[in-house]
């Protein structure tokens, strides 16, 4: 979900609009744990640190192909990635007021959540709290982009495409994110740093 956050920050900072390579972000995140050869996931903090250290570039230079997850990005990609880096991110506590503050300030918030079968089958993207006996599927990252205090829900962008939820967006209860057993990581990204990229 860091790619979606970077896309948003580029628009907010009036930088050229393109999609960062998700495969390269994932590779650099796994490299933090010397796990490039394993498709075992990566923490949000590792992916953010990778984008701070190595930068990122257009997905056109390193397209998403899950079969190529263990291949290092090309030299051409690395040269392009040197031109912009993630500049600022912060790990947040499981605190509603803090998360609401970041979202109200226009800062996207990425969360790493535990996914259950009901999440995959959520009608119109309305994600329920898991019930006793629900099948655990694994971990997954979402990008929180808003909240509804009256309904007690976050608006989240998923990475599964427009077929999930409402055009790729869904809502989940505050409790889903605030429970450390259901949400392991909460990270906000506030800025990217362009070194010599012309402004759009």
Q: What kind of region is each of these model predictions?
A:
Residues 1-8, 30-157, 162-200:
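Predominantly the structural core of cysteine protease catalytic domains
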Residues 7-25:
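Phosphate-handling active-site elements
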